[in-house]
A protein has these predicted regions:
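Edge beta-strands of extracellular beta-sandwich domains
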Residues: 653-657, 803-804, 858-864
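Extracytoplasmic
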Residues: 667-812
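Bacterial N-terminal signal peptides
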Residues: 7-14
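C-terminal outer-membrane/trafficking sorting elements
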Residues: 812-865
Length: 865
């Protein structure tokens, strides 16, 4: 009864969140109990949206928002509208939540002035959740060459004006605007604080209706990570962003850089003086990207996980084709093993309550202070960048959680440029939010510890030792050692903080302010140790010795410890770039050697016991333990996620301990599904299985085609037996207007179209005027199976290139007596042989299919298999 009452109360609270703004309810609530994972259907993968949707595990899918990600590269995404107009229909039919990413930087697939277009997706698609804009710091106010001429990108202020309209649409229709921020130095005037200072209408909208704004930190650039975190966290805690998220990007890793001489100048390539020599350090260690996601979700309340990027090297890729039993060739896509072992597995731990997302109120209470950036910009309308009015005061993080290796104070005079690490060396101090202002009552529970305008002259903050002393009074010491360890209630987030094993090489003389060369060698041997003071457990100490890039999420209870451990990596030195064919095969992505992490419990009254299990799919781990001199030591040798429980883990340290019963329980609620879509369906022929065809072009640009929908097309050719077959689900059985878009440049082509037991022979007339124009032919066809296939066979005539097929419902099935209404849906299906014997499924050859409709009516047909 208690549990039911809690769920009822929680449901009321969730409803209240959805109704918090003055407008329609949010289509899909995002909150700590309903987190969102944005998974990309990305044009760089030439994907089949249906295949990507099918790949997402069913337990995760309700929480996923699919992101239709459009490239600014014309050859990848020639016409963004033609891509999303096709893919949105597939997502709508699947009833999965979907956003559109029209732009990275200033380059956009859509005109910033076409407001009717932006609104139309809300009107047409009940599953549409809004717009996702990435990397809003580059490419503004520039000429960009296209095949048919030059286009000029908008200014940043013009884009900000568009965002005000998108916020109003989000308010009107219950959607979101998601923006990811990734350059705190050279584009500081495009950070979240700048949204409040540079556009009065945006300020008003974010101040009064913040629920529609998702503010994400992004890791694309190789500097300024702490500033980006502080600015985005400040927007969330300060009350001008409804949600706080993370879009991790491997591009932030220092894989290589220009090779420099003793004077700090780039060394020219002797074989090509237009290029410079590169010094290679290491491929990105995948586990290093898991750390900020888990840290920020568990400690600072991020409710949105976007990506990660790069999608083509870290999420999924198109792999080798396969052949069906009846000879069709099928295109395939697959997750990378590191995506499965890190991202899918960690999200599952959020959904099962292991990793609890704290509320905004909890994060504010834990964070305690903020920095208020009160510096007035010189000219808000100028494109000239300023840093001081928009980001943190220089030196804010020094002596707190910034590594001395990362800055050392002297490489460059700009502290933000020097910040190459996102890992933190201390978990004692929470991430410091930088705010424009404290907008609402909850935000005002934060103390403004210092204003930016006063930072340099303030003796407490401008001096590292005094700043640290001030922070030590606010945040007590709960552990010792060189690991990162931070606690919220009974949860500890711990990791090895050594992102790089840096080498600093002094220059012969200072070069434009640079005093030494930084070399970013991977940490392949430096472990980190720490001793934690338990807050709930009654043993005296918990010690950890963590290998490079190891991450531990630990929950302590009075008599046990529950640990989730993560360190998945692939072999170093592979150096595969985007488009490398070797990425198609997992055999070319071997695992990294297993590393050993050690957990030591000190002060248990009796020998504890352990239980553990490997998660996901990686080499089998080995876990051993020993009990000696009052210490219980667990050795975990692994490369990948596992769960470890240390039971009977209790001692005599009971004074001052927090109670297990006071721990906040994680509550996860399944988000509501989108309403059913009743509109036009569209399917791309490049996603159909095929045999004996002239060619299947997943991206048809380089094959000379233009004006296609989706990203490609299929050359049916003229071979005997040429055929394509694709999955074409519809919302209900009935008679449909079928439109096939095609090119027939050399003459008429005749095809046979088959849906279920109905066949139509269709002539595709020769293009009237141009060999490159697309034509359409329309005809009516009954579609009885709502989850069926369409087959198109070549019959005679000239070559036809097939682009897509559209399906529009007209009315009831015409070929079946007794079906008279468009409300008839299939209840169940039975199969029989020709002797009338019931079958469990259709058999090879001829079977009888009997369909029972929900109205009580039935129809029968012969099927051939």
């Amino acid at each position: 009864m208690v549990r039911r009452l809690f769920i009822f109360i929680f449901g009321i609270l969730t409803f209240a969140v959805a109704q918090a703004h003055d407008g329609p309810a949010l289509r899909r609530v995002i909150s700590p109990s309903q987190p969102a994972w944005i998974i990309h259907i990305d044009t760089w993968n030439s994907p089949n949206p249906q295949a990507i949707i099918n790949m997402v595990p069913e337990d995760i899918k309700p929480y996923v928002i699919f992101n239709l990600s459009l490239s600014a590269t014309e050859s990848i995404c020639a016409d963004g509208k033609k891509v999303v107009d096709s893919w949105m229909k597939v997502c709508a039919e699947n009833r999965v939540w979907t956003m559109i990413q029209p732009a990275s930087g200033g380059c956009s697939a859509f005109d910033d002035d076409d407001l009717e277009l932006y609104e139309s997706y809300y009107k047409n698609y009940p599953n549409f959740l809004g717009w996702n804009y990435a990397e809003q710091f580059w490419g503004f106010d520039e000429d960009r060459e296209r095949e048919n001429g030059t286009v000029h990108t908008p200014t940043f202020l013009k884009r900000l004006e568009l965002f005000t309209h998108l916020m109003k649409f989000a308010h009107q229709y219950g959607g979101y605007l998601c923006v990811s921020f990734t350059q705190a130095c050279y584009s500081a005037n495009m950070m979240p604080v700048a949204y409040m200072k540079r556009n009065a209408e945006m300020n008003r909208l974010l101040s009064t209706d913040k629920e529609h704004f998702i503010c994400c930190e992004k890791y694309t650039m190789k500097n300024g990570f702490y500033d980006i975190e502080s600015n985005c966290l400040g927007a969330y805690l300060g009350g001008y962003a409804g949600q706080y998220g993370i879009r991790f990007d491997i591009c932030g890793w220092m894989e290589e850089q220009d090779k420099l001489d003793e004077n700090g100048n780039a060394i020219k390539d002797p074989s090509d003086d237009t290029k410079t020599l590169k010094e290679y350090y290491n491929d990105f260690p995948k586990a290093c990207g898991a750390i900020p996601i888990l840290e920020h979700v568990a400690l600072t309340g991020e409710t949105v996980i976007d990506g990660p990027e790069l999608v083509t090297t870290d999420d999924l890729r198109e792999i080798a084709t396969s052949k069906t039993a009846d000879g069709y060739i099928r295109r395939n896509w697959a997750w990378f093993n590191h995506f499965k072992n890190i991202n899918i597995d960690m999200f599952r731990k959020i959904l099962d309550g292991t990793i609890r997302i704290p509320s905004r109120e909890e994060v504010i209470a834990r964070t305690k202070i903020c920095v208020k950036n009160d510096i007035k910009p010189k000219d808000i309308n100028s494109s000239q960048n300023e840093m001081e009015p928009y980001v943190s005061p220089s030196g804010l993080y020094d002596g707190l959680y910034r590594s001395e290796q990362d800055d050392n104070g002297t490489q460059w005079p700009n502290s933000t440029v020097n910040n190459k690490w996102w890992l933190k060396v201390s978990g004692r101090y929470p991430a410091i939010p930088v705010v424009y202002d404290l907008i609402d009552e909850e935000a005002r529970k934060l103390q403004v510890a210092i204003k930016s305008s006063e930072y340099a002259s303030n003796p407490t903050w401008s001096n590292v030792a005094s700043k640290k002393a001030y922070m030590n009074q606010l945040f007590k010491q709960e552990y010792k050692g060189d690991i990162y360890a931070s606690r919220l209630e009974n949860t500890w987030v711990c990791y090895n903080p050594y992102q790089y094993n840096e080498e600093h090489v002094p220059l012969a003389a200072t070069n434009h302010g640079m005093k030494y060369i930084r070399k970013y060698w991977v940490n392949n041997g430096r472990s980190a140790k720490g001793t934690l003071k338990p807050a709930y457990n009654t043993c005296s100490q918990i010690k950890m010795n963590l290998a490079p890039y190891s991450l531990v999420h630990m929950r302590e209870y009075s008599d046990k410890l529950s640990l989730y451990m993560q360190n998945y990596r692939i072999k170093d030195g592979l150096r595969y770039g985007v488009g490398d064919g070797r990425l198609q095969d997992d055999k070319n992505l071997p695992e990294y050697a297993q590393q050993t992490d050690t957990i030591i419990v000190v002060g248990a009254s009796a020998q504890p016991t352990i239980s553990w299990k490997d998660n996901s799919d990686h080499s089998a781990s080995t876990v051993t333990s020993e009990w000696k001199n009052g210490q219980f030591t667990v050795y975990v040798k692994h490369n990948g996620p596992l769960e470890l429980t240390i039971d009977n883990c209790k001692g005599t340290k009971t004074t001052g301990k927090l109670k297990d019963s006071d721990v906040t329980a994680a509550v996860i609620e399944t988000p509501a599904a989108p309403e059913a879509y009743e509109g036009e369906m569209q399917y791309e022929f490049e996603h159909f299985d095929y045999k004996n065809v002239g060619g299947c072009y997943g991206n048809a640009w380089n094959n000379g085609f233009r004006g296609y929908y989706g990203q490609g097309c299929l050359n049916l050719g003229t071979q005997r037996g040429a055929s394509v077959r694709g999955y074409i689900p519809v919302t209900k059985p009935g008679n449909y207007k079928v439109a096939i878009r095609y090119q027939a440049s050399m003459g008429d082509a005749v095809i046979k179209v088959i849906c279920g037991n109905q066949t139509k022979q269709v002539t595709l007339p020769k293009n009237a005027s141009s060999s490159k124009e697309w034509s359409e032919v329309e005809f009516d066809m009954d579609i009885a199976d709502v989850k069926g296939n369409m087959t198109v066979n070549y019959v005679s005539g000239k070559r036809a290139v097939l682009d897509c097929v559209r399906l529009n419902y007209k009315g009831a099935l015409t070929g079946i007596a007794g079906v008279t209404t468009d409300a008839d849906l299939i209840d169940h299906v039975e199969y029989y042989d020709l002797q009338g014997m019931r079958l469990s499924a259709a058999k090879q050859g001829i079977s009888i299919k009997k369909v029972y409709l929900r109205s009580g009516k039935t129809y029968t047909e012969k099927i051939y298999k």
